Amino acid sequence: MQPITTASLTPAQQQAVRVLAQAAEQADGIEALSEQTLLNLDLPEQPGGRGVKHLLVESPSGMDAYAQVDGGSVELVVAPQRRQRGIGGALLDAALTEGRQVWAHGDLPAAQALARSRELRRVRDLWVMTAEPPTDPDEPAASEGLRVRTFTVGRDEDAWVELNALAFAHHPEQGRLTRADLEQREGQPWFDPEVFFLAEDVNTGELLGSLWVKIEGNSGHAVGEIYALGVHPQAQGRGVGTLLTAHAMAAFAARDLARIELYVEGENTPAIRTYRRAGFTRARADVQYARP
């Protein structure tokens, strides 16, 4: 069956993809599509813009499969009841005419087999690390020349986007976030500026770092995430990250969380070592595959 390719989705199609992703998550025990992919469902067609493409496999019974291509990166999901019929392979083949790499969240055996069948190679590991919520974290200590405050909606967007681009200049996803991307996240139910911490120079007011906390779920079952920790390249070594992390841990301790988690590149050995010392362990890896 030939997937339908479109630059935007109707509201009904957007909802059908979300239902499909939820069904796959329930079947597999892991989210099928990333947050950015789900946010992209709502995007209108953008001539000359990001150029997100949607590939759909529909039948009278509903949405059988879905893939998205964004910046050369592919994510896809197949309905649990429609698997083992060649749909995933056909969809991947079509998506890879537009994209270059494909993500496998959790790197499940079926995804590994599909990658092997297309002679794709493993090119990137993104670890998910988790830890028990802190109960008695250290008080954030004063740091010479630095102060920490929280994000102000309507005032800090442009400065944060500039800082983020510098801090993540070599990161293929985080570093390209725009003000529109930030504002889209500000509209999400989980967004809370009170746990969006900014470190700035006490003399100039220049932003030197940020730590964005994301908390989702009901009390007792909620998950706290170190969503994005970035430090200005010229502020490296000043203790900015340590100071911001202390504020995040205090915020986690003040809430009734089931666990805390973060994402880190599998090749970032120094960061992984630091997180392990802080009590984090690897829970899973999301893997990116590409053609040789």
Stretches found by the model and what they are:
Residues 78, 229-231, 264:
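Hydrophobic adenine-recognition pocket in adenosine-nucleotide-binding enzymes
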Residues 52, 97-99, 257:
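Short, high-confidence coil segments that cap the C-terminus of an alpha-helix
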